[in-house]
Curated annotation (Swiss-Prot):
Residues 1-10 have a biased composition (Basic residues). This is Probable serine/threonine-protein kinase clkA. PANTHER family: SERINE/THREONINE-PROTEIN KINASE DOA-RELATED, SERINE_THREONINE-PROTEIN KINASE DOA. ATP binds at residues 596-604, 619. It comes from Dictyostelium discoideum. Its EC number is 2.7.11.1. Residues 124-143 have a biased composition (Polar residues). InterPro entries: CLK_kinases, Kinase-like_dom_sf, Prot_kinase_dom, Protein_kinase_ATP_BS, Ser/Thr_kinase_AS. Residues 590-920 form the Protein kinase domain. Belongs to the protein kinase superfamily. CMGC Ser/Thr protein kinase family. PROSITE patterns: PROTEIN_KINASE_ATP, PROTEIN_KINASE_DOM, PROTEIN_KINASE_ST. Residues 11-21, 39-123, 148-196, 218-305, 314-342, 351-562 have a biased composition (Low complexity). Signal peptide: none annotated.
Length: 932
């Protein structure tokens, strides 16, 4: 139904277009898991340590035993790869201490806690200094709705990981524009607005699915000491040696508490282990989505096939390459980053978010059937921690047979215990690939762990059996990872994590429930958790289809395809659309009469409401998580807009009115009044002839009223276009030879557009629809919004955006109704800017100086160099100045249009001022069509 797709892409701009982004954290493998949570946090947590990778490793290893320091001295002469290698070697040297501590676990627990706290306090001091730098950075620009910064050394990496409300802004006149996608590295958390603690997740959820409010900070208490507990262990805390994995370092603190609690340790570790793992998955998933057009897909709901953004793709791909290199560098130095998945395209930052998923890909590529179990936590036994680790795994396997709770606890702890050992193998591969000089070191590590690998592989077999019993569905879910899918859905990683958590909840109610778009949970009612799991499983399975279709995920296609077939609901098609059956009843109330059409967001059906005995239109949203979340946002916005009506109950905002909403077979359904054609459909039916000026005047009043209502709620629609404006009814009359005199001069009676096909609207009442991409002003702003022909220049130039982007869209729509065709009909940025310059005149210096990509040093637009772009510029030459498109007697309308299409957002007319413009109140005497 849509004629073009809106590309919601995030691209690097002023702040981190090349090497700035996240590179500061690469020098310290000690805190790489901070990378998973928040790249910007790492930049500042590592400032005290990142003179080079050697010093970073020295920092951690100085806290190790003397034997480790000897190794440190030996390896300082090597390059970064060797340092990483030696770091893992030191970890192996600590195995004996760790094993001894494990043997005497109960007796040594207090001593280990004392030692752990000592190193923890020392690291807090360094961490605090880093956070001073970080705070000074964030405070250098205005913090909009700053989050809790009371203790960054404990809290930054989870609460501030979702820096949804930290925005760098620059004031452009009367408006404050977000530069999240350009100057603020916090934009890595782009989809946190979709999955995190912002308003986008809190919308009307309890009204739709009878769940609790979404709270993204839930269970983050377990993560308060996230980065600090990393150095708390430093591989010296023998009591916590099986938790030495970075990505669950919070378990060290929890386990210290467990030691104090004695018999309570198992249950506590169970919950904490899961919450840490899931939390990391969420945040890094969002980072990936942001840097790989995650929001692109979000906005593509509103698109079709009419336009494309090829130039945008090129622009963003370049920046993605920078991010890819960044990720490779991060993964190279991080203790737990598995680099094997970087054989794929597009720099998989998602590997950072879940080390188990990366291992899953490794096993998948080798065809090893252990891949499921390997990612099942207990099978991560490749190397390290010697024979005692095998015994420990066996001990945990026995526990897993006893109860699912113990199984979850032991799986996570085994995973933590073994992940560091896996680093030896994976980093050895890194060293072999990157530097032949490291071969000897790699061989030494392999020799140290050779026998252990064999023993651990045996344990893997045992763990596979136990895991298949207690967590069988988790095997599939870990294979259902989207590490290599960068161009599809926003929520792939969260969906995967959601699947993992859902299945764990089914087996183990104490697991933390992180990724549900409904609510967070720490157990509770079995039936309630089960419902949540089922609800999110469908969403996650839907995104699994995108993974299977991803070009970047070819080596995992077989696994993902199997998962799709096993988990895909029988009432959905392969693209997550509901398979509508004419005559069926939705929600035991609405009888389906016919299918009206389908878009990227939903399927629209016409139904008979058995309660009110009238026809309604029901939008059945696709079951994929990203579409479900957008629907929840839209529901909340529509309910708030309805409150803007006046006291007599008449709905004046001219926004579509929501009659009902419900969940039906894992699909959000929105019930509306049955409206008529969209403005675009009417223009098409009328063969793209212009509308009379009197009708444009009436539509202008209603459209500006709708925008004013939204802006009063601090809401930006972001996707105004004729397709998203519906007529209340489709009543119109056909003109034949009896055309009114004032119309004849405007109609070419000699063309193929015969006169008898001309349509004249009888009722011009309209409503604005499609609020799935609407954004509140105080929430995160993605870089690219608005459909291409209606996109304002500030978005193209990367200056940020706010309410004026809607005003520009209104101007484009009104001119299109006046002309009968799109004013800026283009598909790339260069041509788009050239069209604007041709129609509206040269850009002001405040805009031309922003981007050297599009403007030269003299402030004039750069001309294309390749033949395709040169050919595309030929269309620009056929355009006229805006004034030349307007009839001489329509000066008032021209004045309004030119003020709506003002270049500078700060000077662009507001919705409230536009409603007072003289054009909206004058009597139209010469009601002719369009331009002369």
């Amino acid at each position: 139904m849509d004629r073009f797709q809106t590309k919601r892409k995030t691209y690097s701009y002023n702040g981190y277009s090349n090497n700035d982004y996240g590179y500061y954290n690469n020098n310290c493998s000690n805190v790489n898991y901070n990378n998973d949570i928040h790249y910007k946090n790492n930049n500042y947590n590592n400032n005290n340590n990142n003179n080079n990778s050697n010093s970073g490793n020295n920092f951690n290893n100085n806290n190790n035993n003397n034997n480790n320091n000897n190794n440190n001295n030996n390896n300082n002469n090597n390059n970064n790869n060797n340092n990483n290698n030696y770091t893992y070697g030191n970890n192996n040297n600590n195995n004996s201490n760790n094993n001894n501590n494990n043997i005497n676990n109960n007796g040594n627990s207090n001593n280990n806690n004392n030692n752990s706290n000592g190193s923890e306090n020392n690291y807090f001091q360094s961490e605090n200094q880093s956070n001073k730098d970080q705070n000074s950075y964030f405070n250098s620009s205005y913090l909009r709705n700053p989050v809790d910064n009371y203790n960054h050394n404990n809290n930054n990496h989870n609460n501030n990981a979702f820096d949804n409300n930290n925005y760098n802004t620059q004031n452009l006149g009367d408006y404050s524009y977000k530069n999240d996608g350009y100057n603020n590295d916090n934009n890595n958390n782009d989809n946190n607005n979709s999955y995190g603690d912002t308003d986008r997740e809190k919308y009307s959820i309890e009204k739709i699915c009878n769940e609790n409010d979404y709270d993204s900070v839930n269970n983050n208490n377990n993560n308060r000491n996230y980065s600090n507990s990393y150095n708390n262990n430093n591989y010296n805390d023998g009591n916590n040696n099986y938790n030495s994995n970075n990505y669950n370092y919070n378990n060290n603190n929890n386990n210290n508490n467990n030691i104090n609690n004695n018999n309570n340790s198992n249950s506590n570790s169970n919950s904490n282990s899961n919450s840490n793992s899931n939390s990391n998955s969420n945040s890094n998933s969002n980072n990936n989505n942001y840097n790989n057009y995650g929001y692109n897909n979000h906005k593509s709901n509103n698109g079709g096939n009419r336009y494309s953004d090829d130039d945008d793709n090129v622009f963003n791909n370049n920046n993605n390459n920078n991010n890819n290199n960044n990720n490779n560098y991060n993964n190279y130095n991080s203790n737990n980053n598995y680099n094997n998945d970087y054989d794929y395209n597009d720099g998989k930052r998602a590997n950072i978010y879940s080390r188990n998923n990366s291992n899953n890909n490794n096993n998948s590529k080798s065809g090893n059937n252990n891949s499921n179990n390997y990612n099942h936590n207990n099978s991560n036994n490749n190397g390290g921690y010697n024979n005692y680790n095998n015994g420990y795994n066996n001990y945990n396997n026995n526990n897993s047979n006893n109860s699912n709770h113990n199984s979850s606890y032991n799986n996570n702890n085994n995973n933590n215990y073994n992940n560091n050992n896996n680093n030896n193998n994976n980093n050895n591969n890194n060293n072999n690939n990157n530097n032949n000089n490291n071969n000897n070191n790699n061989n030494n590590n392999n020799n140290n762990n050779n026998n252990n690998n064999n023993n651990n592989n045996n344990n893997n077999n045992n763990n596979n059996n136990n895991n298949n019993i207690s967590n069988n569905s988790n095997n599939n879910n870990f294979n259902y990872n989207n590490d290599n899918d960068r161009n599809n859905s926003n929520g792939n990683y969260n969906n995967n994590s959601s699947n993992i958590n859902n299945n764990n909840n089914n087996n183990n109610n104490s697991n933390s429930y992180h990724n549900s778009c409904i609510s967070y949970s720490n157990g509770g009612s079995n039936s309630k958790n089960s419902n949540k799991n089922n609800y999110n499983n469908q969403q996650s399975n839907a995104n699994g289809n995108h993974v299977g279709n991803s070009k970047n995920n070819e080596s995992c296609n077989n696994t993902n395809t199997n998962i799709e077939k096993s988990n895909k609901s029988m009432w959905d098609d392969e693209n997550d659309y509901y398979k509508v059956q004419v005559g069926e009843y939705l929600n035991n109330r609405y009888k389906v009469l016919c299918t009206v059409g389908s878009g990227t967001f939903s399927t629209v059906v016409e139904c008979w409401d058995t309660n009110s005995s009238g026809q309604v239109a029901i939008k059945i949203v696709r079951s994929a998580k990203k579409y479900t979340e957008d629907a929840l946002v839209e529901i909340d916005i529509l309910r708030n807009l309805e409150k803007t009506g006046n006291s007599n109950g008449k709905y004046l905002s001219h926004c579509i009115r929501l009659l009902d909403s419900f969940l039906f077979k894992d699909h959000i359904c929105l019930v509306f009044k049955r409206y008529g054609l969209s403005l675009y459909e009417f223009l098409k039916k009328n063969r793209y002839r212009p509308l009379p000026l009197s009708q444009i005047q009436n539509i202008s009043k209603q459209l500006l009223t709708a925008i004013y209502s939204m802006h009063k709620l601090s809401l930006v629609h972001t996707d105004l276009k004729p397709e998203n404006i519906l007529l209340e009814s489709s009543r119109f009359t056909y003109f034949d030879n009896s055309i009114p005199l004032q119309f004849k001069n405007s109609i070419d009676t000699t063309s193929n557009n015969s006169v008898d096909h001309y349509c004249h609207l009888v009722d011009t009442d309209i409503v604005v629809i499609d609020f799935g991409g609407a954004t509140f002003e105080n929430t995160h702003h993605t870089a690219i919004v608005c459909s291409r022909p209606y996109r304002p220049p500030e978005i193209i130039l990367g200056m940020g955006w706010s309410y004026p982007c809607d005003i520009w869209g209104v101007g484009c729509i009104l001119v299109e109704l006046y002309l009968g065709y799109t004013l800026f009909d283009t598909h790339n940025n260069v041509q788009h800017l050239a069209m604007m310059e041709k129609v509206m005149g040269p850009f002001p210096n405040s805009m031309s100086n922003v981007s050297k990509k599009y403007f030269n040093d003299y402030g004039t637009l750069n001309r294309p160099q390749n033949s395709d772009e040169i050919k595309s510029m030929e269309r620009v030459e056929g355009l006229k100045q805006l004034k030349e498109y307007f009839h001489p007697c329509h000066d008032s309308f021209f004045d309004l249009a030119s003020r709506l299409l003002e270049y500078q957002p700060s000077k662009r007319i507001s919705a409230s001022d536009a409603l007072s413009h003289p054009f909206l109140f004058e009597t139209i005497e010469n009601d002719c069509f369009g331009p002369i």
